[in-house]
């Protein structure tokens, strides 16, 4: 089945990359940017990252094209996609690696072909030219602090289960390190699990095993690394008859997770602005495609196991609880209140204060405010990206500041 899937996806990839053939995009103002995303199962990639990157590339380089492919969580397929982009003449590639180690040889091949690679969300190994992600340690710290607050004094022993992400991802260790910096000496970690491919079903099985081994009355909270894992944890708690549900963290701001927060089933999620990350990645790729340095965009440098001082932008994650959904996700137009609050959640949304205007109303209000000479409700991230782009136009490359080491 895997071989069949690989054949199908490779065929579709060839069609989607047809505009990236040899001889195209050779002019200074017209070239192809490759975009490789890791999964079709996680909602954000197709709904947010892909269209936002495509839109931003077009805004920065009207004659450029984006050749897109999704690896469907298969590292072998992603290597094939990467190699195809190199062969077909992409001038820059944005890639979120399924497996950062497995992709190393393809990153090296891109370097030999003088095709710069921007690592997106996860730091791929090999000679990448730029990296954009969120501060993973801060993600973990936000989760740890939220879990401690939710458990409060009622859980004096603070016995938790720690549900980490896929060990293949360097971000998993990054998140865990941040969480442990907050939780160590304040909780007892009774069980700890790796959840392959961040899968909900695996998380549910692991949590079911933890409940069986420990007993539901001997767990006070669950540190879940992302929303897919949180979904599996909460499903297992419900199946075991745990009531009230335990505090459970998350990450990703998936719509179903936001709705669980509204219902009181999930404690929080960590929001990482899709638009902000997409804008920086597109800016880096277009700059590199034009033969310019990304040092003017980068705000720091990072080290991978293979490459030191990679120019990077590490963005700031934001915690989201029931009381902050409107001023984060709704304000940033990730979701409208109408999307978050179907009829069966209307009363819960009212309790959470989600009674404001729809996305359409919000957009109309913002347009009126812009006409009046301001946009006080605008997204701060956009201003930050604008400053990056102004820097690219105004000044030559300069070395990044500081050093971080994600995924070690």
Identify what each model region corresponds to.
Residues 15-19:
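C-terminal motif of bacterial Sec signal peptides marking the signal peptidase cleavage site
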